[in-house]
Amino acid sequence: MAEKLKVDTDEYYFRRPTKEDGGPVWELVREIGNLDLNSSYSYVLWCEVFAESSIVVEHKETQQIVGFISGFMHPEKEDTLFIWQVAVSSTQRGKGLATKMLLQLLEWNESVNFIEATVAPSNKPSNYLFLGLARKIHTNWKISDYFKTDHFPAKDEEHEEELLFRIGPMRKNKNKRMI
């Protein structure tokens, strides 16, 4: 069972998800509308099984989940956190919440030396997020081809290619709180 870390800021609680968060996370992703919406079961399962490498943000005043990152430790690269989805409520955008969630995940997972994520070229917010993270923590980044359009079924509305972002190595500073 994952230790349920919780970080308190003026406006938010940053914490590891629980299976009870799966439904609200599904609602958040559905509300956002520009992410691939998976089954509600997958979010419940993700919040339970991959809690150590994921994060939710709860708004203090409304007690609503307003942010979520799903991640997992790459099975072939033990020092690499792979980020699958980044979701921020439209009511909370422009506050740096996605970056703060990534920084908190790095603080909680000290063994992480690299972050990877796939991003479509047209997804400017995610492009800016990962490049901005690399700049903020003063580390390297590499962008390479990963999934071509022909990797996806033709019935998938001609899914756009996905580029692989690799951020790192991380420079650890144990005395610095990240968010």
Swiss-Prot record:
PROSITE patterns cross-referenced by the UniProt entry: GNAT
Alphabetical keyword list: Acyltransferase, Transferase
Entry EC no(s): 2.3.1.178
Residue span, N-acetyltransferase domain: 12-153
GO term, biological process aspect, one: ectoine biosynthetic process
Disulfide bond positions: none
Pathway per the UniProt entry: Amine and polyamine biosynthesis; ectoine biosynthesis; L-ectoine from L-aspartate 4-semialdehyde: step 2/3
Gene Ontology molecular functions: diaminobutyrate acetyltransferase activity
NCBIfam families in UniProt: ectoine_EctA
Family: Belongs to the acetyltransferase family. EctA subfamily.
Descriptive protein name: L-2,4-diaminobutyric acid acetyltransferase
Organism: Oceanobacillus iheyensis (strain DSM 14371 / CIP 107618 / JCM 11309 / KCTC 3954 / HTE831)
Phylogenetic lineage: Bacteria, Bacillati, Bacillota, Bacilli, Bacillales
